[in-house]
């Protein structure tokens, strides 16, 4: 298969964007194409530069690697994975510092790497009304339980048990392509006004490519960290601005003894606590 692309493409792909994750997750499996890029063969003789070594960039690089296409990855930081990070020092199990939820059935993990089957070899924890919630002093009536069962069936939720999203991406994508990553190379300008694309980094160094894949996060695009010449089309700009991106953070705390339930989801208006 020959690839005919414009000189620049922006991949708006994320493992876990906060907005609309339920709406997206519940339908993503059904909307997943029968064949994905990893299933196909590509031919391209030019050089491709991928901007960003997050999940999208690593997945794109894996496709190019498998098809022997000349490519390079420019990563702004000193690590790969983007918002996928893990901590192995705080506890005796890895802690996801970035994305951690799988808003879908386990088979989606196979589809992402081009494998058949509805179940994955990854060890996962399913979330259901029986395994997830308990309440202080309140028993579920049958109708409430049925409603919540239906909710979890429509919005399936899983988490990795003894690994993380970072491990999944590292094992299936990064280990094949990390030798092509230039770390600490933040791109500040992309000029695609001629046949060749010129990328300039913050230290003034220029990199030349025939095609460019921009895989930075939506937050970076919204902040206009990268200057494009010519400017992005109104269609692309509107698409970027329409994606809602809310701030958030994670706080992991370690105690000498357990004095609390497994976790607290929220406090309701009447003071009841939900645990998961």
Specify the residue positions occupied by each region the protein language model found:
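FAD-dinucleotide binding site
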Residues: 5-11, 21-276
